Amino acid sequence: MAKEVFQRTKPHMNVGTIGHVDHGKTTLTAAISIYCSKLNKDAKALKYEDIDNAPEEKARGITINARHIEYETANRHYAHVDCPGHADYIKNMITGAAQMDAAILLVAADSGAEPQTKEHLLLAQRMGIKKIIVFLNKLDLADPELVELVEVEVLELVEKYGFSANTPIIKGSAFGAMSNPEDPESTKCVKELLESMDNYFDLPERDIDKPFLLAVEDVFSISGRGTVATGRIERGVIKVGQEVEIVGIKETRKTTVTGVEMFQKILEQGQAGDNVGLLLRGVDKKDIERGQVLSAPGTITPHKKFKASIYCLTKEEGGRHKPFFPGYRPQFFFRTTDVTGVVALEGKEMVMPGDNVDIVVELISSIAMDKNVEFAVREGGRTVASGRILEILE
């Protein structure tokens, strides 16, 4: 069966659900999908099981990899990524956040903000997300007085991480909305959330005129057709027949794009902001991996050593309790990749939690990098610093 062509009739935006494990992110994602499928006869409703679709997730009942679904409101087309909340999977949440223009923060009304709520807010801020909407979930399980306290607490947190004091808060039960899609009272919270997204989230300016760049999130092979790399186009446009370079981690190599798809539909051209799959000519699955980038030839090069300005999180923010010294070896997260690197300090003997400092980093493998790109620094399963590249050294 021939695939249909994606019709670009509404502005496209990437959003996602973030928040602590078990606060209801996947349930809300499913509730939105079911609600939108009722409004739009062409839309496919995805149940909770469809979104949480890896066997180990079903077994543990938690989301591990970021999952994408699509839906439409009256005004916009949304790609929605359901981000994992589980601590060991936060690196996949970073990949997901790297693809979002705005986020929906889920907080369970019966338990309030938890450590991961804070970590996700910090990561959202570091990944350049400017606006969030709070969804206070599990309203049916919480005492009304507690809900008021949680609301105040969450708004304080949201402000602390640089988001607006006027961030909308939507209250409801995602499980109720998912389970009773025909009941207007149950789905009212989803309706309010979607209206809020259309009105409060700004459509991002897309860098369509810059050279093409896509950070590879996943790679799979389609028998008889070749290898597909998926990810969000960061800048530029891509069409069938164009040459691209695969940059970072391994030797740079050229290939030609033989297909561009989004949500199983064919695209005339992929453009900045789209989550796409690109079919690549003559590339084996083993030749390309998550963390590399696909780019217009000659526009980005791989590097190992750079100077950066970083902010070290305090103990209260979930960071280190003790200082670090020259020779420190954490993981550096750029776009969709994480690489170990060694830190050198200039004119300083150590860096304390809470410090803003300039450091020099040498990574153990080369990755595609640009000046001003932001990154997160993690160690032992937690985010310890965030930074920005000031200058590429070699």
From Swiss-Prot:
Region of interest (G3), ranges: 82-85
A molecular function GO annotation = translation elongation factor activity
Which CDD domains does the record associate with it? Answer: EF_Tu, EFTU_II, EFTU_III
Q: Where does this protein hold GTP?
A: 19-26, 82-86, 137-140
Q: Which SUPFAM superfamilies match?
A: EF-Tu/eEF-1alpha/eIF2-gamma C-terminal domain (SSF50465), P-loop containing nucleoside triphosphate hydrolases (SSF52540), Translation proteins (SSF50447)
Keywords assigned: Cytoplasm, Elongation factor, GTP-binding, Hydrolase, Magnesium, Metal-binding, Nucleotide-binding, Protein biosynthesis
Region G1: start-end pairs: 19-26
EC number(s) of the enzyme? 3.6.5.3
Q: Which reaction does it catalyse?
A: GTP + H2O = GDP + phosphate + H(+)
Q: Which parts of the sequence bind Mg(2+)?
A: T26
- Principal cellular location given in the protein's record: cytoplasm
Q: Where is this region: G4?
A: 137-140
Identify the InterPro entries for this entry. EF-Tu_GTP-bd, EF-Tu_GTPase, EFTu-like_2, EFTU_2, G_TR_CS, P-loop_NTPase, Small_GTP-bd, T_Tr_GTP-bd_dom
Family listed:
Belongs to the TRAFAC class translation factor GTPase superfamily. Classic translation factor GTPase family. EF-Tu/EF-1A subfamily.
Describe the protein's quaternary organization and the partners it interacts with.
Answer: Monomer.
UniProt function note = GTP hydrolase that promotes the GTP-dependent binding of aminoacyl-tRNA to the A-site of ribosomes during protein biosynthesis.
Put simply, this protein is called Elongation factor Tu
Q: Which gene encodes it?
A: tuf
